Amino acid sequence: MEETGIKDCVIEEICDLAKKYGVEKVILFGSRARGDYKRASDIDLAASGGDILQFALAVDEETSTPLRFDIVNLDEKICEELQDAIRTEGRILYEKI
């Protein structure tokens, strides 16, 4: 997924951590999903199901990237504008089958 500026190994790490913590879905959104990111842009993720808090902590600590993560819990109420952004520009990175 190099067009997002995120190395494939980091995507794999995110997916592995989603499985580990029972997360059902992880969506990339924001500048990295749109392709208009800068080199140091953070990685915006929206996640649902499972232990989102532990997933978020692990993603920050255990992935092999110096980039910062901003993780939105889709199981909680979020503003309409953010919902629209996730819906329109989101790219599914992981979905439990």
PLM features: residue spans?
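Catalytic core of pol beta-like nucleotidyltransferases
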Residues: M1-K25, A33-R39, S48-I97
